[in-house]
């Protein structure tokens, strides 16, 4: 059979069909142009069109993983490449932590339209997700994203230092905030030039936890916050019950986008004082002109909460 296969491949060029033999009984057939094979590793090949394709494989240490790059494209927009890589690596890191720390409930505070919850499911997390999004337009999209997922709860409220009602700035896409923009923020984002407000309900997190964790035996919650400058207020509302979280994630700013928001050092100091330690820092946004990082996703754990390996 193998000999017949080879004979048939050998006949194809006579009728104008080209063959790129990949070995092990595999081949690519094509009519025009040039194809090149780049071996990526055992059982994996990349087939390139043309003679000058710029794809390059970069081994990632001794992990067996390989990064496949179009060097010309990545060099032309290094900033976007770095941010995209950071987003991917952050997702992988968080997923690994959720597994290592046996997390069975993720609180997604500042859920917007459900991007974080969808990512968790895509990366394999199967535990409970509880998402909080106070604005009407985003919440409608969030509720739709969670439909059909019985262990993904959604709440149309904001979280903060006290139970109250507040006005939130809306119309800023994913950057809606309870805080007004800073002068730096106004200069960076044109969207801040126009705003309207919406009245929302705000609750303390410690008053919500019993409801959120109901029905879970031995809860091991993880707190994700992305509230556009308001994360410390959310955290303050956890009170003494912050000690129940085995890990957390907060968007921390090196450059203030919102008036009255904390700088990165201030926020991290508060989290560390409550027993959390950093496991990863991933750039979320960077200035195009200077390369300065504007915001990081800061991932932290309570090291004493790690389960013993069996």
Regions found by a protein language model. Give the residues of each.
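Phosphate/nucleotide-binding beta-alpha loop and adjacent structural elements of enzyme active sites
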Residues: 1-310
């Amino acid at each position: 059979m193998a000999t017949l296969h080879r004979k048939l491949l050998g006949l194809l060029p006579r009728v104008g069909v080209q063959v790129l033999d990949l070995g092990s009984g595999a081949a690519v057939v094509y009519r025009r142009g040039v194809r090149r094979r780049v071996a990526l590793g055992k059982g994996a090949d990349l087939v390139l069109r043309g003679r000058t394709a710029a794809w390059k494989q970069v081994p990632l240490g001794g992990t067996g993983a390989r990064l496949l790059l179009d060097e010309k494209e990545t060099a032309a927009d290094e900033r976007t490449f770095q941010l995209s890589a950071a987003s991917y690596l952050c997702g992988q890191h968080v997923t690994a932590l959720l597994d290592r720390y046996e997390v069975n409930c993720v609180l997604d505070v500042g859920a917007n339209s459900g991007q974080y919850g969808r990512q968790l499911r895509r990366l394999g997390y199967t535990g409970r997700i509880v998402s909080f999004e106070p604005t009407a337009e985003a919440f409608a999209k969030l509720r739709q994203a969670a439909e059909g997922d019985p262990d993904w709860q959604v709440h149309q409220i904001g979280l903060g230092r006290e139970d109250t009602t507040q006005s939130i700035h809306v119309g800023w896409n994913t950057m809606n905030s309870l805080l007004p923009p800073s002068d730096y923020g106004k200069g960076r984002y044109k969207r801040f030039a126009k705003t309207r407000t919406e009245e929302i309900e705000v609750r303390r997190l410690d008053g919500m936890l019993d409801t959120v964790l109901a029905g879970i035996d031995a809860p091991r919650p993880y707190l994700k916050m992305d509230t556009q400058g308001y994360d410390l207020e959310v955290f303050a509302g956890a009170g003494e019950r912050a000690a129940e979280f085995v890990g957390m994630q907060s968007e921390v700013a090196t450059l203030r986008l919102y008036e009255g928001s904390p700088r990165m050092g201030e926020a991290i100091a508060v989290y560390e004082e409550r027993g959390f330690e950093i496991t990863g820092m991933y750039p979320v946004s960077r200035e195009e002109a200077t390369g300065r990082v504007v915001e990081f996703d800061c991932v932290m754990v309570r090291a004493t909460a790690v389960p013993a390996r069996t």
